[in-house]
Amino acid sequence: LEEVLKKTNVTQAELDAIVGAEVRQRGPLNWEWVQGILKAIDQHVPLSSGASIAIATKDVYQYLCNAAIANQINDGVMKAMQPGVPTVVVSHSLGTVVAYNLLKNKGSALGWEVPLFVTLGSPLAVTKIKQMITPIGHPACVKKWFNAMDERDIVALYPLSKKYFQVAPQIENKTDVQNPTENRHGISGYLGDPEVARRIHAALT
């Protein structure tokens, strides 16, 4: 990652503004350092944003760039949805991209009804991903959208907030999850959060 950063001409000041000098000095043995470099590349070198996705979210990159892979994944998800049946959709990581893509582009036409759409550890707000799914918007078949992230998660670089992912109605964001998994991205760490679990349970009962 340091080599990638050097090639992008991102300055030390720009990196420090994102991660802070203390985190930078601790180096690559902490996730904040990794996340900071990915954010610096994403924010200051638009043409290199694809590289940051490939490093941190290879599966997402393949889904967006390989039609055969995308079609196979999409078909599996679509078989699980039933028209006219209220369905709570809980998604994580690549799954948030897949779910969003299908809900937005096919949900209404297929008669899907989603009272709650939950995205966990989502990379949807990463610049290159947004460019590849433009135009972005709130899926018409979704009544409420709840997004949760650990700010140290290297895949979920940004919240799905007005600043990074502007849709109407706005998405409710929870950014204080303390994901105990090694890379702060594991799904078990998100589902174990009391508020995340409460939201899902409430929507199902």
Predicted regions and their residues:
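N-terminal accessory alpha/beta regions
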Residues: L1-A17
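Lipid deacylating catalytic domains
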Residues: I18-V90, T96-T205
